[in-house]
């Protein structure tokens, strides 16, 4: 059976650079790897084909021979077929270690080739903090208490009882990973005995039960700057769980949420407030007093003939912009309130007004009903 062209197998041009070959190979190897296609014979064949093509084209001398003679260069009596040495195994191990292990490579546990047991970074923590809109306006310092874990002082984070120490894992030789043969190919997996640490604790510390960490509650002060918005995340570096074996601590992420306000709605740095006004004030004009987010009050002049939903802008009375000197605006939207529970005299006065009113007093409604009449008249004419 004839072999496919190696360039065709990798899906690259004959002028492809070394980096282009490597990218194509990694992509195809991921797709056809036997561990990702268990029991799929076709995938296994394609995987071997991809490996063979890359081994040839990634070697300068073999590629030159292949470009000149094709597959005949590696037939019996030729230059020799592409091999799969230890260097290739190490290279492929680097590619697949994050896919077929448990993620204990960098920056966490495990150990490098020939190195000491790796440091393990502490876990990140999350804290949800709810504040008021006024606190978001002015900023504040909040003291919080968080449950976390710190390095055990009794064993200095090793997990071993005082006077003893962890021993090198006999299963993986302290490497933290073991190799499993997959046909002609070797795949690395996290060691099932030491779980990637490279060490085993035979006599665990009684204070932490061999975990190397103990649970504690910590008190922290969080600076909430003025102008924060709902959903903002504050990162406190190194304030998460302690690392193991000298590893760095994780981070603490504080997620802010802002309580609903009884008066104000927020849109970015701008605030909106709906204020009811009397029918008389709307008709004759007047002044109303409205609240401001800083706790003060301000006056708004209502002109005669103001309608519901009319909006008034008060510049510079909104929220501060985070890490800026800019400030948003306050928008007052009025709602004309229809009077209720009228006395006899009040009803009489309104009836007198209605009898004396003309379309000039209600231009919007007069215009609307005029359009309605025109609509029906034109409809009747067409019929």
UniProtKB/Swiss-Prot annotation:
InterPro entries: DnaJ, DnaJ_C, DnaJ_domain, DnaJ_domain_CS, HSP40/DnaJ_pept-bd, HSP_DnaJ_Cys-rich_dom, HSP_DnaJ_Cys-rich_dom_sf, J_dom_sf. Zn(2+) 2 binds at residues 169, 172, 191, 194. One of its GO terms (molecular function) is heat shock protein binding. Binds 2 Zn(2+) ions per monomer. Zn(2+) 1 binds at residues 152, 155, 205, 208. Residues 5-70 form the J domain. GO terms for cellular component: cytoplasm. SUPFAM superfamilies: Chaperone J-domain, DnaJ/Hsp40 cysteine-rich domain, HSP40/DnaJ peptide-binding domain. GO terms for biological process: chaperone cofactor-dependent protein refolding; DNA replication; protein refolding; response to heat. Keywords: Chaperone, Cytoplasm, DNA replication, Metal-binding, Repeat, Stress response, Zinc, Zinc-finger. A zinc finger (CR-type) spans 139-217. The keyword Cell membrane does not apply. It comes from the Bacteria. Belongs to the DnaJ family. Participates actively in the response to hyperosmotic and heat shock by preventing the aggregation of stress-denatured proteins and by disaggregating proteins, also in an autonomous, DnaK-independent fashion. Unfolded proteins bind initially to DnaJ; upon interaction with the DnaJ-bound protein, DnaK hydrolyzes its bound ATP, resulting in the formation of a stable complex. GrpE releases ADP from DnaK; ATP binding to DnaK triggers the release of the substrate protein, thus completing the reaction cycle. NCBIfam families: DnaJ_bact, PRK10767.1. The J domain is necessary and sufficient to stimulate DnaK ATPase activity. Zinc center 1 plays an important role in the autonomous, DnaK-independent chaperone activity of DnaJ. Zinc center 2 is essential for interaction with DnaK and for DnaJ activity. HAMAP family: DnaJ (MF_01152). This is Chaperone protein DnaJ.
